[in-house]
Each structure stands twice: as structure tokens, then as C-alpha cells.
Design a protein with these regions (language model features):
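Short, solvent-exposed loop/turn segments at secondary-structure junctions
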Residues: 35-37, 62-64, 106-108, 133
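Conserved beta-strand signature within the Rossmann-like core of class I S-adenosyl-L-methionine
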Residues: 52-72
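Core SAM-dependent methyltransferase catalytic element
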Residues: 105-133
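Short alpha-helix
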Residues: 79-106
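A short, conserved alpha-helix within the catalytic core of class I
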Residues: 36-51
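Class I SAM-dependent methyltransferase SAM/SAH-binding core
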Residues: 1-20
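A conserved beta-strand element that flanks and buttresses the S-adenosyl-L-methionine
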Residues: 29-30
Length: 133
């Protein structure tokens, strides 16, 4: 029998159903390589703003250095992905009261975009923090 309890030295709840988010407050919200599968991610954030943590982390996320675009993905998933622009993501989070405090890039082949988009794409980690009033 496998235990579901792991002592990390702090409380950890993992919630994967959006309806369960309504009654919770979070320190950290993690989007791990997911936003490219939701073409309306940025426009839908306003309705989810109250449910984002004080910190928002994007990991292994392909972002456009120019305008957003749609590309085929070449990995285990072979469908379409919407590559949101770094500028749009930054602007939306600024409007929501967040500040970008960390960014890093990963090897570009991880973005798995069509060849014509490779030079326009960065595969990134971003960390935003909620500004205090």
C-alpha cells in the first residue's frame, strides 16, 4: 500500500479540478507547460484572478518573441498548440497586479514548434509575484 503522505515541512494541496479552486487561497500557482493548449488562456485569466497565488510560476513554456501563433507540436502530443507571446503574458500579469521577478530559458528544441517558428520562439520559465498594495 502506497502512502499519499509526504512530509515536505509545509502544507501542500494539489488541486486539479477548477471548481475546487473557488474556496481556496494559494501561495503559489504553477502552470507547467500548459498554457499553449488553451488558446483563450490570457483572456480567461481575469475571471480566475482571485484564484491565483501570490506567486505564479510558468515552467517549460513555449512563448513567442513576436506575435502569438498556432503551430503543430512534435512530441508525444502531435496536435496544435497556441504559442502566446512573451509580451502579452507579461502585460496581462502586469494588469493583474503582478511583477515578473525571474525568467530563464531552456534549450529551444523543447518548444517543439514547426521549423518556421523556431527563431521566433523561446522555451521559458517565468516567475511573477503579486504586488502588495
Amino acid at each position: 500500500l502506497q502512502s499519499n503522505f509526504v512530509d515536505l515541512g509545509f502544507r501542500l494541496n494539489i488541486i486539479s479540478q477548477e471548481e475546487n479552486l473557488l474556496s481556496e487561497q494559494f501561495d503559489l500557482t504553477i502552470f507547467g507547460s500548459t498554457i499553449q493548449y488553451d488558446k483563450n488562456f490570457l483572456t480567461g485569466l481575469n475571471s480566475r484572478n482571485l484564484h491565483l497565488g501570490d506567486y505564479v510560476l510558468f515552467t517549460h513554456t513555449p512563448l513567442s518573441l513576436e506575435k502569438p501563433f498556432v503551430s503543430k507540436q512534435f512530441s508525444d502530443y502531435t496536435g496544435l498548440q497556441t504559442i502566446h507571446s512573451f509580451e502579452d503574458v507579461s502585460k496581462v500579469f502586469e494588469k493583474l497586479g503582478y511583477n515578473l521577478i525571474f525568467k530563464s530559458t531552456l534549450p529551444p528544441e523543447g518548444a517543439s514548434v514547426e521549423d518556421e517558428y523556431t527563431n521566433k520562439t523561446v522555451y521559458a520559465n517565468l516567475l511573477f509575484t503579486k504586488l502588495k498594495n
